[in-house]
Amino acid sequence: MLLRFIAENIFSFKDAVEFNTFPSSKSQTHPHHKVDCSHATVLRLASLYGANGAGKSNLLAAIDLLHKAVLEGSLDKIGLYDNISFRFDQSLKNQPSGLAIEFFHAEKIFYYHIEFKKGEVLLEELYISKKTRDVEIFRRDGNKIHINEDYLPKGMSNEKYVDVLDRFIRPDMLLLSFFGHYYPNEIKVITDAFMWFVDSLRVVLPDTVSGYVPHLLDKHAPFRELVNDTMPELKTGISSLEVNKVPVSEETVQGNQAMIDAIREARKSPDTPQVVQRMTEAGVEIANIVFEDGQVWQKTLVSVREDARGHLYKAPISIESDGTQRLIEYMPLFFSVT
């Protein structure tokens, strides 16, 4: 059960923002709305409210990012190459982003926290939260790993154990996932925490914008005309939509396995777009990878807006609100019935 989630210096969050399921100390009614989780009392259900652009979707995206990172076991495998720190303060650009989650599972309250910059884990720690103190299970600070010897296999010292781990753990890898995937029987308490991400945590997001829209907008003139006639009338601030189209190859995306796989699939099926999700500084971006005219292209959507002086500027579609992205997503349906 999710108890608390904290995000800092990521997407639209500059300072640490917390979402939790703890009841207000002032509320003494509706006891059936609460449930005991070890020493903590939490709500069975919590909702998130806020104005358009307040960060609701980004909070869910941050939870989804952590979930995917743990399941995959690597920041590289989820395409986390670009800086996704808070984008409106340049002083934070080179500072790490942080995600922390507290949850109840296997009769224990766990606290898991990571800090990272681009594709490198800088800090990772797992604790068991008790009523009066927190018990460290492991802590990884840079390339220094410490595991609580109370949880190590009998006869194994922390120094010897960590020496072995250092040979396997790359900077992009998560220690929690390494144990969960490859050594689930080694340290049970770590496996318990990992299995909560596998079996219990589910993140349901709105269907991603784009899909095949970048390719359709690029190649189908009637659809492009309809979209750009309609968007200004919807009062979203967008004057038109364009496609950013750049050539890509396996050499230009070295290290990004998702892109490499998409390029190879695109070559097998010319003119059929492959959909790739990427993490960028602006947020989650959907790209179409298409092999056409003897070249592999990456196509992404950009919105064209007008500033206060009447100058046009372009921005990635990923910075638009969920509502605006949903409108764009419905454009193929709208086109099919007109």
Predicted regions and their residues:
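Short beta-strand segments that buttress and anchor functional surface loops
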Residues: L99-F104, L126, S303-R305
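Pre-Walker A-like glycine/lysine-rich segment at the N-terminus of P-loop NTPase domains
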Residues: M1-L65
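Short, mixed charged/polar active-site loops
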Residues: K14-A16, I109-Y111, R133-V135, H311-A315
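Conserved P-loop NTP-binding catalytic core
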Residues: K34-S47, A51, L60-V121
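Electropositive, glycine-dotted interaction segments
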Residues: Y111-R264
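Amphipathic alpha-helical domain-onset/packing element
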Residues: M1-N9, D218-V248, S269-I289
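Conserved ABC ATPase signature
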Residues: L45-L48, R264-F335
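Coil-to-beta-strand transition motifs
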Residues: K14, N94-P96, E107-I109, K118-L122, ...
